[in-house]
């Protein structure tokens, strides 16, 4: 069937049924390509993030051949069909209730590397995403961010302060940062007016 073009091979023992389009054979959905890397025995072990979800977050329109997966333990990148699958170590536990927030935090983490968009444009979109989170989700996002690196917490703090969240959340993030460390993040003060308060340069 593979030789007849009815199904396409992804990797050893993994195939998908391709549809013909005007541009050629369709790609399989990202989730189908990596399903076995996201769940094992009914338990979540990873989640799509980075390049894989920038489109759904309206952070980029670019389609990438790299699929990124958040996992709790380091794994080497692998190749599967036309896709490269890269793994990002996630220090928080992975469960259905926090995947959405982990994806947002990963976008903050890689703000300077999001394709086909400037850091300022990405920051404007992140401001909107943070603003649309419920107060409860904002609290959970802050809690999850505490396991990320300092500059992610600083950028989250600046964004949250700009959108006017409760002081308790701002204080929690400020206390988690080292006294005089500065963070080089390429976002302008015109877009993020609170950046200097968080020692972002």
Label the model's feature ranges.
Residues 78-90:
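A short, charged helix-loop
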Residues 94-201:
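Hydrophobic alpha-helical interaction segments
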Residues 10-14, 41-77:
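Short gly/ser-rich loop at a beta-strand->alpha-helix junction or flexible surface loop bordering the NTP-binding
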Residues 42-45, 91-99:
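Structural motif
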Residues 2, 6, 58, 109:
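Hydrophobic/aromatic-lined pockets within catalytic cores
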Residues 21, 89-92:
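Secondary-structure transition/turn motif
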Residues 1-39:
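Short beta-edge/loop segments at beta->alpha junctions of small alpha/beta modules
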Residues 6, 61, 131-134:
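Short alpha-helix boundary/capping elements
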């Amino acid at each position: 069937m593979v030789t007849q073009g009815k199904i396409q091979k992804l990797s050893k023992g993994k195939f998908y049924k391709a549809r013909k389009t005007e541009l050629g054979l369709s790609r399989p959905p990202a989730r189908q390509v990596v399903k076995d890397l996201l769940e094992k025995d009914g338990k979540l072990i990873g989640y799509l993030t980075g390049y894989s979800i920038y489109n759904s977050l309206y952070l980029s329109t670019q389609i990438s051949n790299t699929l990124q997966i958040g996992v709790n333990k380091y794994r080497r990148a692998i190749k599967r069909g036309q896709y490269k699958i890269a793994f990002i170590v996630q220090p928080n536990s992975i469960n259905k209730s926090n995947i959405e927030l982990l994806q947002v935090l990963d976008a903050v983490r890689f703000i300077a590397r999001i394709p086909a968009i400037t850091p300022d444009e990405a920051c404007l979109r992140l401001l909107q995403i943070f603003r649309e989170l419920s107060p409860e989700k904002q609290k959970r996002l802050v809690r999850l961010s505490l396991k990320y690196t300092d500059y992610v917490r600083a950028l989250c703090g600046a964004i949250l302060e700009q959108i006017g969240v409760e002081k308790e959340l701002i204080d929690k993030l400020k206390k988690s940062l080292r006294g005089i460390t500065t963070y080089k993040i390429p976002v302008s003060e015109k877009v993020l007016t609170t950046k200097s308060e968080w020692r972002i340069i």
